[in-house]
Amino acid sequence: MDMMLMIGNYFSGVLIAGIILLILSCIFAFIDFSKSTSPTRTWKVLSIMAFILGIIITVGMLIYSMWGKHCAPHRVSGVIHTNHSDISMN
């Protein structure tokens, strides 16, 4: 749960880092494709790794924000208590 609290505290920073990685992947791909010589493996690997990490971080942050709105522990426990009587809780 410490990881969730850390992500909650630095949500905007992590989301910005994911967007920056996506921008970097576009820059690396542009550098790779703009060469007149044969493309080097280094720029391809940098572009692919930046893209994959950027997508994982960005989609992960979107999923985390939905989790915080709909599945946070205080919301789930509140729903359980309102939907069940005291007898079924015991």
Curated annotation (Swiss-Prot):
UniProt entry tagged with the keyword Endoplasmic reticulum: no
UniProt topological domain (Virion surface) ranges: 32-44
Alphabetical UniProt keywords: Disulfide bond, Membrane, Phosphoprotein, Transmembrane, Transmembrane helix, Viral envelope protein, Virion
Consequence the record notes for mutating residue 77 to A: No effect on phosphorylation
Consequence of changing residue 65 to A: No effect on phosphorylation
Phosphoprotein as UniProt keyword: yes
InterPro entries named in the record: Poxvirus_A14
Topology versus the membrane: Multi-pass membrane protein
Lineage top rank: taxon: Viruses
Positions in the Intravirion compartment: 1-10, 66-90
Residues recorded as bearing Phosphoserine in the entry: 85
Reported effect, residue 34 to A: No effect on phosphorylation
GO cellular component: membrane; viral envelope; virion membrane
Location within or outside the cell: Virion membrane
Coiled coil region boundaries: none
Outcome of mutating residue 12 to A: Loss of functionality. No effect on phosphorylation
A Pfam family of this chain: Pox_A14
TM ranges: 11-31, 45-65
Task performed by this protein: Envelope protein which is a major component of the mature virion (MV) membrane. Essential for membrane biogenesis. Is required, together with OPG144, to form bona fide crescents, which can progress to form the immature virion (IV) membrane. OPG140 and OPG144 form a lattice that is stabilized by disulfide bonds and serves as an anchor within the viral membrane to which several other proteins important in virion structure and morphogenesis attach.
Membership in a protein family: Belongs to the orthopoxvirus OPG140 family.
Assembly description: Homodimer; disulfide-linked. Interacts with OPG144.
The name this protein goes by in its record: Virion membrane protein OPG140
Source organism: Vaccinia virus (strain Western Reserve)
